Amino acid sequence: ANGDWPGSNMKLWRERVAGSKWRWMIYDLDFTFGGNAQGLATTNTLAQATATNGPDWPNPPWSTLMLRKLLDNPDFKNEFIQRFAAHVNTTFEPNHVLAVIDSMAGNIASEIPRHKERWPQSISFGNSWQELVDIMRNFAIDRPANARGHFYSKFGISGSSSLVIS
């Protein structure tokens, strides 16, 4: 969940040559993973990204137009829902995300004292480094169920089924 999106922190571009494809990039994700009150595990970013009349920040109508129009296409809508389901059950499965967080935190933990000394305002929540990592860990645990609920509500899905391939 990024509470500072989709009206900011994204860029769209393409080369000005025949046949070039549009590119999309999101950046500046410090409002994600529970790092800000607008980026909590319960934040309904699907509603933000599809609102027709959002406020100037974070989701003015121009910033949601592309996804709204794409979702008007039944094939795209189905693929969007299917990809979400695949990713929420694999890429964003809590144990997988926790392993990534723990690995990354372990890789940089020894640098945190030097970082705090050099940039004392960069970790400004008043929490310890480990408390900030724990906020991310809790987000990783709580987010999938919330995001599923947002998809179920938006698209009128009554539930899910499990498929095991041996």
Regions found by a protein language model. Give the residues of each.
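Middle-to-C-terminal accessory/interaction subdomains
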Residues: A1-I165
